């Protein structure tokens, strides 16, 4: 099991975070504070994301946050899933 941070909680980030969690990894999912409503929606579901396609299941994400330091704390692997047009905001 690896401790993994997924940065950007859009469709791709959520799918990746869920897949990794279902595979037994310890996953933190982060997005920018301006996307707090997305983060809060996942939190209201008990930090769960449901996958329904080739991979199915309900994954529990250990940490869902808008705090980048918290998401990266102890991460062995970091995935950055923001689309190219949205990446600049992560570096401002």
PLM region spans:
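Short, flexible active-site loop motifs that bind/organize anionic cofactors or intermediates
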Residues: 2, 61, 77
């Amino acid at each position: 099991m690896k401790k993994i941070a997924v940065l950007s909680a859009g469709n791709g980030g959520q799918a990746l975070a869920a897949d990794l969690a279902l595979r037994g990894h310890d996953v933190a999912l982060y997005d920018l504070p301006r996307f707090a409503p997305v983060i809060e929606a996942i939190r209201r579901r008990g930090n769960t994301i449901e996958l329904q396609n080739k991979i199915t299941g309900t994954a529990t994400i250990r940490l869902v946050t808008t705090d980048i330091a918290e998401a990266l704390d102890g991460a062995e692997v970091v995935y950055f899933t923001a689309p190219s047009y949205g990446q600049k905001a992560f570096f401002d």
